[in-house]
């Protein structure tokens, strides 16, 4: 198991996110002072597109660990974790603008948020026959998404 985690960790550090996925600014959020990426990865042999966000470490992105975050369910958007729990910005109840989250996990790690399964959050599932999900096909899609981005 440790070997697998080591390979995944090395792959995460050596991966170059597509420049087209780089986020340079967001409305109603403080300036971005770290690598922030948002994009899609296709699931092979389907029309599904899984949305991801990657918040690179604010400390040392080339040597800090990677955390892959999936909100519970399956069926709950991982953007809730990004926006209200441990992401680089937070939007508290009743607020209309994001604030910098001083306790963000990306202070010391590269955090990869996965919107799973397809059809949840910003993920796309245009063929409704592919949208029914259970633990097994969600796990398969999650693995494909992680392998595609790392």
Model-derived features: positions:
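Catalytic-loop region of hydrolases
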Residues: 2-66
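N-terminal cap/lid subdomain of alpha/beta-hydrolase-fold enzymes
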Residues: 49-140, 147
């Amino acid at each position: 198991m440790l070997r697998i985690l080591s390979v995944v960790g090395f792959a995460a550090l050596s991966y170059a996110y597509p420049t087209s996925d780089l986020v340079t600014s967001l409305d109603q959020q403080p300036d971005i002072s770290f690598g922030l990426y948002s994009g899609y990865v296709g699931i092979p042999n389907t029309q599904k597109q899984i949305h991801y966000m990657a918040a690179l470490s604010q400390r040392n992105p080339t040597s800090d660990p990677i955390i892959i975050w999936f909100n519970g369910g399956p069926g709950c958007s991982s953007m809730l974790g990004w926006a209200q729990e441990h992401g680089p910005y937070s939007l508290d109840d009743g607020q209309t603008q994001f604030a910098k989250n001083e306790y963000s996990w990306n202070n010391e790690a590269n955090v990869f948020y996965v919107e799973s399964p397809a059809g949840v959050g910003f993920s796309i599932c245009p063929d409704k026959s592919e949208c029914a999900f259970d633990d097994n096909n969600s796990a398969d899609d999650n693995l494909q998404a992680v392998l595609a981005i790392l």
